[in-house]
């Protein structure tokens, strides 16, 4: 793949910020959108904007075909066995909350355990905290190695017959750690537990086969994978979803409504109450077409090369601390000695370089790292080695500036 040519397909990247060419290194927060996705959204709103499912008119049929067609694209993209297993949500957060509120509250009780890790995004911690309080279950944390990885031996020791749910991110949004979720799922199932995978940072960057991974649930967002904001996906095994109750009620998800009772539609629609995110789903479908045309294997390889190049370039700079393992996904999180991450990001932004600074919705991990915040550069298919060179130059400038200040 040619990242320089791919970059030309993303209009927002063709601009100057503060007098310098934009270098966008914040795709772990949200990705930019290619022309193909922008045009798909524009086409929907210009040509066949309508509500879905019940309309017999032409626009309604076109909108329904686009919406349900996107569901099939997603099924194929993650290798689910049926579109009944693909639930549209507002994002990863909503998807995890759905599982916690529906499956969790129905299947957890006093003495049961939920196993997660200290590296989780808040969206995969807080829902389990809440359901644990409501049910009397206990949150148990897998220990991390010094480099922020999980040791399978520790998984074997931690998961027990008390464990009912294991919920782990596939890829850390801070460390870039790629967790062995397939092996963890096998251990969870051996003890009768189910496995949820937070795929927000993996689905955009690598091939996903939920059946190969063996997970019971898999959640991800459209906006991190070249799609629109406000659209996400929950994959769930049909056997689980059929037993789960909806957590949002209203139009679209009902089969029959009486004065005192109601019944629900079949899967997947019983979990999609209200007017659905039609444009978002169509845009996500276009994003999947775009990514598949390039090839997820090629994207993963490209990002791996960028991550290793970034590690090499940052290792040349004195006073830098880089967090996470050597083998990682396409991001680097770091601090400069005696310089606050927000100051780092501000100086970089003055030269048109966009990075993220803060706790990255991972405060327990920041405590584990013994820092309050970090700076993060994250890469996607449109980034190049020249972008990383610009980052390294900007970090050197930052060091020099604050060296003079202090």
Swiss-Prot record:
Keyword rRNA-binding in record = no
In terms of domain of life, where is this protein from? Bacteria
InterPro entries (UniProt xref): Aminotrans_V_dom (IPR000192), Aminotrans_V_PyrdxlP_BS (IPR020578), Cys_dSase_SufS (IPR010970), Cysteine_dSase (IPR016454), PyrdxlP-dep_Trfase (IPR015424), PyrdxlP-dep_Trfase_major (IPR015421), PyrdxlP-dep_Trfase_small (IPR015422)
Gene Ontology MF, one: pyridoxal phosphate binding
GO aspect biological process, one term: cysteine metabolic process
Keywords assigned by UniProt, alphabetized: Pyridoxal phosphate, Transferase
Q: Which cofactors, if any, are listed as required?
A: pyridoxal 5'-phosphate
What CDD domains does the annotation carry?
A: SufS_like (cd06453)
The catalytic activity of this protein is classed by the Enzyme Commission as 2.8.1.7
User: Which residues carry the post-translational modification N6-(pyridoxal phosphate)lysine, per the record?
Assistant: 224
Residues at the catalytic site: 361 (cysteine persulfide intermediate)
Q: Does the keyword Phosphoprotein apply?
A: no
Among Gene3D superfamilies, the record links this protein to: Aspartate Aminotransferase, domain 1 (3.90.1150.10), Type I PLP-dependent aspartate aminotransferase-like (Major domain) (3.40.640.10)
Catalysis performed (reactions): (sulfur carrier)-H + L-cysteine = (sulfur carrier)-SH + L-alanine
| Annotated PANTHER family | CYSTEINE DESULFURASE, CYSTEINE DESULFURASE 1, CHLOROPLASTIC
Q: What does this protein do?
A: Catalyzes the removal of elemental sulfur and selenium atoms from L-cysteine, L-cystine, L-selenocysteine, and L-selenocystine to produce L-alanine.
Query: Into which family does the record put it?
Result: Belongs to the class-V pyridoxal-phosphate-dependent aminotransferase family. Csd subfamily.
Tell me the protein's name. Probable cysteine desulfurase
Q: Which organism is it from?
A: Halalkalibacterium halodurans (strain ATCC BAA-125 / DSM 18197 / FERM 7344 / JCM 9153 / C-125) (Bacillus halodurans)
Record lineage: Bacteria, Bacillati, Bacillota, Bacilli, Bacillales
Its gene is csd
